[in-house]
Regions:
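S-adenosyl-L-methionine-dependent DNA methyltransferase catalytic core
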Residues: 1-122
C-alpha cells in the first residue's frame, strides 16, 4: 500500500544468490531469514525481528528489505506513529520493542485483577 523506494530492493545478483540456495519455491507472501551460516528459511510470517545485534537478514518475498513502517507494524505500532529516525535506528527500535497489543492486553488484565482485588476489600 505504500511506494517502496528502490533502495529497499535487492540487486538481481543478490536475488539470484538467494533463490539458488532454496530447495523449493517459497509461498507468497513470505519473510526470508538468512542466518550467519547462510541458511535461508522462508516462512509466511516473521519469527525474528531483532535489533542490530542480529545477523538475520529479513527480506520480503526474496525481493526487498522491510521498510521502517512495516517493521513497526509487525510490532503493533499504529500507522500514526511518526518515524523521524534513520532506517538503522528504526530497525533497532522495532527489534527491541515489545509488541504494543501484547502490552495492552497485559495492562488490561492487570487492571481487572486490581479492580477485583479492591472490590473484595469492601
Amino acid at each position: 500500500d505504500e511506494d517502496i523506494p528502490t533502495s529497499y530492493f535487492l540487486s538481481e545478483a543478490m536475488k539470484q544468490k538467494r533463490f539458488s540456495a532454496l530447495k523449493t519455491i517459497p509461498p507468497k507472501p513470505s519473510i526470508w531469514h538468512e542466518n550467519i551460516g547462510g541458511n535461508i528459511s522462508t516462512l509466511p510470517y516473521s519469527c525474528a525481528l531483532r535489533a542490530g545485534g542480529s545477523y538475520n537478514y529479513l527480506v520480503v518475498n526474496g525481493e526487498r528489505r522491510l521498510t521502517s513502517r512495516e517493521m513497526l507494524r509487525l510490532q503493533g505500532f499504529p500507522d500514526s506513529f511518526i518515524i523521524n529516525i534513520p532506517y538503522s535506528q528504526a530497525r533497532k527500535v522495532a527489534g527491541n520493542s515489545v509488541s504494543v497489543p501484547v502490552v495492552q492486553a497485559i495492562a488490561g488484565e492487570m487492571i481487572k485483577a486490581l479492580d477485583e482485588q479492591n472490590s473484595c476489600k469492601i
